[in-house]
Amino acid sequence: GSEAQQAEWLPRIIGGEVLGAFAYVERQSRFALHDCQTTATKSGDGYVLNGEKVVVFNGEQADHLVVMARTAGDQSDNDGLSLFIVDAAAAGVDKMSYAMMDGQRVANITFKDVSLSADALLGEEGGALAVVDALTDEAIIALAAEAVGIMGVLNAKTLEYTKTREQFGVAIGSYQALQHRMVDTMMAYEQSKSLLFKALCEY
């Protein structure tokens, strides 16, 4: 963003006065960013925002959103995407929150004829893709790290359970059929961990 935007927002975010969320994933395209169908259409000195974003982390609690929207071109135009600062309480913003499998709460957010002033544009028009690309790489690796960590904990707990849970007087871990299943899950975990480390090294 501009120096004025940084001066206005960064101290408030760092100080905890403002909680933000990044809304860029869409239902039909997921991480295919160029396929963004949310639009910000010029209207007078500002814009009118329409569209939907899904799986917005912190979306339920956030009071401001950074939203990626198309300001020019079509789905084949990578240079027509821009970022906007949107008040989450503005007229036309509607949230639906839900819990993911790991318990984290996320939100789907729709924008219907949301009026934005000219200074809501974050940075330059058409400059969103480079910023979002970099953040997406980090986000995907972070999510993978979380998933691999959860997988490791669950495997360890399951292995411990097979050693202490008895059936017919012996630990269930002594049964070959269960041992085969545990080996499969451990192999999947080690493979996932190796892929995560490879992604971290290459990134």
PLM regions with names:
Residues 1-4, 30:
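N-terminal glycine-rich flavin-associated loop
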Residues 9, 36, 52-54, 95-98:
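Short beta-alpha junctions and helix-cap segments that line functional grooves
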Residues 28-31, 55-58, 74-75, 98-105:
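Short Gly/Pro-enriched turn/cap motifs at secondary-structure boundaries
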Residues 23, 52-94:
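A short core secondary-structure module
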Residues 2, 51, 84, 109-111, ...:
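Residue-level signal for inorganic ion chemistry
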Residues 93-190:
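Glycine-rich beta->alpha junctions and the first turn(s) of the following alpha-helix
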Residues 16-25:
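A short, Trp-centered hydrophobic/proline-enriched beta-strand micro-motif
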Residues 38-41:
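A structural signal for short hydrophobic beta-strand segments in well-ordered beta-sheet cores
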